[in-house]
Amino acid sequence: MKEITVTEPAFVTHFSCSGSACRDHCCKGWKITLDKTTVKKYLASKDTAIRTIAQDHIILLKKNNSHWGEIKLPSALGNCPYLDEDRLCRVQKTLGAKALSHTCSSFPRAHHTYKNEVRNSLSLACPEVTSRILNDPDAMALSEKTIIQQTFNTAPLFPAQQKLLNLFCLSLINHANSSTEAALYALIKFVMYAQKFAKIDDAALGELEQVYAALLEQLQTGVLAQELMNIAPDSKVKTSLVLQMQDYFRSLPLNRGSVILDHYIQCLLRVLTAEEGVSMEQKVSDIESSLARCLQADEQQKNWAFRNLILYKIWENNFPNQPNVDPLRALYIIVAEYAFIKLLTAASVHERGRLEWDDVTNIVYSFHSRSQHNSEVAKNFHRHIETVRTGDDLSMIHLLT
């Protein structure tokens, strides 16, 4: 028998689907794939409604056993035909949870499997997941348990060096207090130092531990926050990000989350173009000031909401250990996503005159629903971010100023 370590953040442990109460349920507006077993089960079901819907609404593709068919939706934003009048799944109610396809039974859950470890996570494309991360100060607290199984998983080993690097990065962000930007600045410095080593061995880790300790002290004493404030801002980097991002999202076909995200993008564009004679760069500065004032007045949630979002990104992506991705480039993507989400939030605050965390939840989940619902969608989105980066990874510092 073999021991397997299972690690997961608190938001995973405590997650439960909100069902019919969900603000934007996952049974609509995107591709629902069905495996071969599920297709055959529905087509042969003794339940007349299940069988009839299968005959009328399952498109047989037979690409492979995992992608044998797809649900045909009535429109780009239409509901799955198995969703009943109470916004609950007819299959689950009639046949039980075991009758669900892999797609329907697994979302929003994700499992990153290694030889003797499993890291559990959840997708931010689910609004309930996003709400937990933004509203629970302990959402990213990690816990471990050991399970026993007959054999090791058929997956590569999770190297101890990679695990330690990931923990260093998580810890730097976790000590951000209310300055997530300063913590990201510390992370940039840490990654730049790590890239000096051709190989991360025990000797390199010894040096990196000293660098981590020094950066942590500079974070806690406010040195890095002051250093970041002293960097002359370049708002053109942010306006370029806005234009590229809105261009990308508006070019996508309609799917789940598109109406919500477009509402906030339109809000941002209105705010940035409202006054003639005022540059977009100045308007960016104005709306950021509005958000900063509202965050300053928020005595609690400001200290963890955006910090938790970055912690999630580092955990979910096993940063900085993504295969075949330069760590600075991977960090640029994290910073660019964070900056755009903050700008959408700032525009909403500027128009409303107040900060509503429900707006932030809407922005974050719809952003991820549109950009990272699956690996192929995420790759296309990250390729688009490359046009903003213009070959200069360190321009991300200007997204933090």
From Swiss-Prot:
Main EC class the enzyme belongs to: transferase
The EC number(s) this enzyme carries: 2.1.1.-
Annotated TM spans: none
One GO BP: methylation
Keyword tags: Methyltransferase, Transferase
GO molecular function: methyltransferase activity
Family to which the UniProt record says this protein belongs: Belongs to the FliB family.
Main function: Post-translationally modifies flagellin by methylation of epsilon amino group of surface-exposed lysine residues.
Name of this chain's protein: Lysine-N-methylase
Species of the source: Salmonella choleraesuis (strain SC-B67)
